[in-house]
Amino acid sequence: MNLHEFQAKALFREHGIPVPEGVAVSDPAALGEAISSLGGDAWVVKAQVHAGGRGKAGGVRLVKGSRELEHAVGELLGGRLATHQTGPAGLPINTVLVESLTDIGRELYLSLLVDRARRRVAIMASAAGGMDIETVAAESPEKIITLHVDPAAGYMPYQGRRVAFALGLEGPQVSALVKLLGQLYRLFVDSDASLVEINPLVVTKTGELIALDAKINLDDNGLYRHQALAELRDETQEDAREARAREHELNYVRLDGNIGCMVNGAGLAMATMDLIKLHGGEPANFLDVGGGTTAARVAEAFKLILSDEAVKAVFVNIFGGIVRCDLIAEGIINAVKEVHVTVPVVVRLEGTNVDQGKQMLAESGLNIITAESLTDGARRVVASVQ
């Protein structure tokens, strides 16, 4: 789950991490109060969407005077912002963040994330702040500093000093970064985050460290421990199908192809997509219906897949380990009838009661193609859309 910048900065403030003075505005009528609260005669207006590249797309604007501020807020609120991360449709702008200006001396990069290979929290830092960190990693990997935090010991001040020296900080700035990293680590652990990023972390001309931007991604598996954070979810920033899938305990990710996939098990789902690609097809989605698949869940999965108009065929690949194949076949038949599926459906079943399941599909009288193997199923479904 992603947080908006203004939500992330609110958490930063709670943990003592310095951020610019700012006010989140969702209604233009609240601008007067925001101006009074912030003071000054120049501000930065930032569109609040779950995507990077906002500045290049016109979503971050420097304004002078209340008239320019009103114009910028009026243009952004209620519109959509398309960046290189959103696709051409963009994301809706329901809130803007109005902030006081910061006197920037240097721009740095700082983040904490989960390194799954090392099973540790990784601290990443770079003197090339304000840039796309993926670009820095690809073009100048030597500019990125990476340290790992031992989960038993936790963050240690010496690690902060190593980062500070590598970034070229001096004097009080070293102590400030050591403290800031400790606060970031505590926030990361306390909120079950998967990523906490500051880009840029600025050194002002007076030598202060300020988080000019803030990005927090939370681990969905830990949200049950953080009800207040879970309530910050903005579903308008998410794919509507993915939100609907969550309600029915389905793991769904939309892709760009035309072959819908329904599989039980994440590993089998990925293997299924690989084979579709291998045979010249393009998966329209990743969909894991889970181990305890039921007829109702299968029906909902069909509805979800077919709500994508790009889908021209569906490949159902189920291994009946926890559930019996005859029950799965019954669910598929009922779902095809209920949803009025008009595209070809290729089904590959394997496991408990597989013969009964295949017989039920064959006798259903529906447009269901039974595959003998995973490879056979991939070939058949790709052929059906060509």
Curated annotation (Swiss-Prot):
Q: Which cofactor does it need?
A: Mg(2+)
InterPro entries, per the entry: ATP-grasp, ATP-grasp_succ-CoA_synth-type, ATP_grasp_subdomain_1, Succ-CoA_synthase_bsu_CS, SUCC_ACL_C, Succ_CoA_ligase-like_bsu, Succinyl-CoA_synth-like
Q: Which GO terms describe its cellular component?
A: cytosol; succinate-CoA ligase complex
Q: Which residues are recorded as binding ATP?
A: K46, G53, R54, G55, E99, T102, E107
Q: So where does substrate get bound?
A: N264, G321, I322, V323
Q: Where does Mg(2+) bind?
A: N199, D213
What is catalyzed by this enzyme? succinate + ATP + CoA = succinyl-CoA + ADP + phosphate; GTP + succinate + CoA = succinyl-CoA + GDP + phosphate
Q: What is its EC number?
A: 6.2.1.5
For this protein, the record's NCBIfam families field holds:
PRK00696.1, sucCoAbeta
Q: What is this protein called?
A: Succinate--CoA ligase [ADP-forming] subunit beta
